[in-house]
Amino acid sequence: MIKKYHHALIVGAGPGLSASLVRLFSSNGLQVTIAARTVDDLEDLCLEAGATSIVCDSSNGGDVANLFKSLEAVPPDVVVYNPSARDRGPFIELDPTSVKQGLMVTAYGGFLTAQEAVKRMLPNEHGAILFTGASASVKGYAQSAPFAMGKF
């Protein structure tokens, strides 16, 4: 039997792909929750799609755990991980601390999010976790090394 999806959580939401997914999921009858470091710019999208927004820094384990705990009444059965952290510039001039923070968001945050999602999906034997990527994952572009590393 194919189980129907009910609640989509998009972590790392912004005006591009995430906004399109919010509209798509909502138009197909799913409850939608958007999580991002800042949600002020997402208010119009939430109103349009009937979505809920929650502030969450995906590189912070406590934030991610609290995000999922706040959704336990109706846990998400679709989780999309779509954050972005970019430090642009020539490779030899990049600040190592900024690059590390970018990897914390793109890679480590993905681990944290997937771990919390799986904890809830396994008992239900149902769910989907999707990680977005970019062409940078297979071809880094000039002045975009940290972005490419995080999308690999």
Segments the model singles out, each with a brief description of its role:
Residues 85, 92-111, 130:
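Catalytic Tyr-X3-Lys loop
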Residues 114-115:
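A short, exposed helix-loop element centered on a Lys and neighboring polar residues
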Residues 11, 76-84, 106, 131:
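Rossmann-fold scaffold of SDR-type NAD(P)-dependent oxidoreductases
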Residues 14-15:
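Conserved glycine-rich cofactor-binding loop
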Residues 30-42:
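Conserved glycine-rich Rossmann-like NAD(P)H-binding loop of the short-chain dehydrogenase/reductase
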Residues 6, 75-77, 121-133:
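Active-site loop of short-chain dehydrogenase/reductase
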Residues 128-152:
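Catalytic loop of short-chain dehydrogenase/reductase
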Residues 48-62:
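Rossmann-fold cofactor-recognition segment
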